[in-house]
């Protein structure tokens, strides 16, 4: 944007509409602002979410063995790997992030700002149903292995959330093998820290899910290894959930694992959508390679307590994948 005055090339939107899947890198720079004061780059993210109707923001929260947590500027294991494995499904096209907002100015001074929060039946139904379908295919909560969907809202205060919870209660009985669970967003933020093992899938309105997933990233080791998917009925986009970290640009020091796990999520989604076993196997291979490097603990970037470069972590993960690729190539050759 600083060079061209455009957030992205005009042809990029058309390419995204026809792509099998979209992989998005982190965007944004504090010096790159639109004439209205908004950060340049947000139009790319929201343009794709709204334009392609990517209504389900899927955020896996999984702690891999070997990952230490940075608490009080010290690295130590606080949560246990076998007890942190849940997914937050965040509604992605409504809530406070819809462009229904404005300001009132008097005498050159902004006196009033309004952000309208939109919750519709259609929007709530489809993302809540998505969460239940996801729970059906998962292994359940670590504590008891029960399939469970937690409805996260603030229905004791907000009218939109009363509609949200009512729709959840309409959908839940259709999934007899999935347990119902409820949490107000303020309580949920402490419960996932205290007892993450109780959760399997949680579903939340847009802004609540946004806040909760950033907090949940701490449980898995931080934003540097947190990936997410933006999924609709016809399209999907995958991304690391962290920002662009311009202060680290060009230093080869940031953690590449969030982006690599975004690729893993993309392979998994494509494999399921297309019925392609090779893509599904690729997703499993990438995750296993990441898990192997994390468990060894020898090649980690600064955010995980190590001193390795970004490129060194990428190389270590690629080396873990090499034997897998070799075995599959040999098997394919024998099959011929």
Residue ranges: model-predicted function:
Residues 14-17, 51, 76-82, 141-143, ...:
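Solvent-exposed alpha-helices and their adjacent loops that cap or buttress functional pockets
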Residues 30-34, 245-253, 304:
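A short glycine/serine-rich beta->alpha loop
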Residues 108-186:
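Glycine-rich phosphate/diphosphate-binding loop of Rossmann-like nucleotide-binding domains
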Residues 272-328, 336:
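Internal helix-turn-beta structural module
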